[in-house]
From Swiss-Prot:
Any coiled-coil regions, as ranges: none
Lineage of origin: Viruses, Duplodnaviria, Heunggongvirae, Peploviricota, Herviviricetes
GO CC aspect terms: host cell nuclear inner membrane; host cell perinuclear region of cytoplasm; membrane
Main localisation: host cell
Post-translational modification: Phosphorylated.
Subunit structure of this chain's protein: Forms a heterodimeric viral nuclear egress complex (NEC) with NEC1. Interacts with host IKBKE; this interaction inhibits host IKBKE kinase activity and IRF3 nuclear translocation.
Protein name as annotated: Nuclear egress protein 2
Length: 336
């Protein structure tokens, strides 16, 4: 049975594989072991080989990893390092800042800008505040939130030059941009319910291991998984993939709990929840009023212990009586 540290590493790797890039599969080299959590260690969580012309959602993946680590009470924030060793350009994801990177031991450390030429043996290090500092001169302060603007990286890798272009994507509609978070919250609720069922079954059988006859799906490996609210290359807010084959990595893995997704759900679907409550209130009020004012269905009533037939005029008879009364009134006025 996997330890909690191994399960957390699998969850973080699945987040990177699923949301880092939209098109194509990623070449990911995963690392495992408790030394990944050691402070100052040079062992990354995973290493992703960057390809020419691809767009990578760096800020979204970074915020996702930071959110999960914060819920696990991890003391430090993740660090992304883009490096060029002359043979390949890679993105290394660390759970903390490795020692010696800023001092230049691994090569010159370049800052984040719109176009960054990445020569051989140079690196670009992205920390907790680098995305906000990069977006601040480009967008309004109200648009610094992840749902309104997102920093992405487009890689230009050729034989003679390697350039990283950092862009800010903005969503024309915040509701479309929040569908990814909505999907995450829905998946977490499904997993919480399925986890409770599995725990109940394990207690009944008397053990916590896998039960005979029940198969559990494994990790996603290096395959690319795209969420239903994933972003397009040109406009991440307009992309909507509705095919049933697009799964989230935690659909088959017990990775998210309801408490982890609660802050995101509360922030992102506040207005839809309010509208849902309004509809529920109106429905309850309407049903209550109908119950109060619905006439009796039976045509028999009991008054004072005596039976009395309840006569009610049909709609067409009421119309006939009204027309007759109007005709008699006109005749009376004509004769007078």
């Amino acid at each position: 049975m996997a330890s909690p540290e191994e399960r957390l590493l699998d969850e973080l790797n699945n987040v990177i594989v699923s949301f880092l890039c939209d098109s194509g599969s990623l070449e990911v080299e995963r690392c495992s072991g408790a030394h990944v959590f050691s402070r100052g260690s040079s062992q990354p969580l995973c290493t992703v080989k960057l390809r020419h012309g691809q767009i990578y959602h760096l800020e979204f993946v970074y915020k996702f990893l930071a959110f999960k680590l914060k819920n696990c009470n991890y003391p430090s924030s993740p660090v992304f390092v883009i490096s060029n060793n002359g043979l390949a350009t890679t993105l290394r994801c660390f759970l903390h800042e490795p020692s010696g990177l800023r001092s230049g031991q691994s090569g010159p450390c370049l800052g984040l800008s719109t176009d960054v030429d990445l020569p051989k043996n140079s690196i670009i290090m992205l920390g907790q505040d680098d995305f906000i500092k990069f977006k601040s001169p480009l967008v309004f302060p109200a648009e610094l939130d992840l749902l309104k603007s997102m920093v992405v990286c487009r890689a230009y890798i050729t034989e003679h030059r390697t350039t990283m272009q950092f862009l800010v994507f903005q969503a024309a509609n915040a509701q479309k941009a929040s569908r990814v978070m909505d999907m995450i919250s829905d998946m977490s609720q499904q997993l919480s319910r399925s986890g409770q069922v599995e725990d109940t079954g394990a207690r009944v059988t008397g053990g916590g291991g896998p039960r005979p006859g029940v198969t559990h799906s494994g990790c996603l490996g290096d395959s690319h998984v795209r969420g239903r609210g994933g972003w397009d290359l040109d406009n991440f807010s307009e992309a909507e993939t509705e095919d049933e084959a697009s799964y989230a990595p935690w659909r088959d893995k017990d990775s998210w709990s309801e408490s982890e997704a609660a802050p995101w759900k509360k922030e992102l679907v506040r207005h839809p929840i309010r509208r849902h409550r309004t509809r529920e209130t109106r429905r309850m009020r309407g049903s209550h009023s109908r119950v109060e004012h619905v006439p009796p269905e039976t045509r028999e009533t009991v008054v004072g212990g005596a039976w009395r037939y309840s006569w009610r005029a049909t709609p067409y008879l009421a119309r006939v009586l009204a027309v007759t009364a109007v005709a008699l009134l006109l005749m009376f006025l004509r004769w007078t």
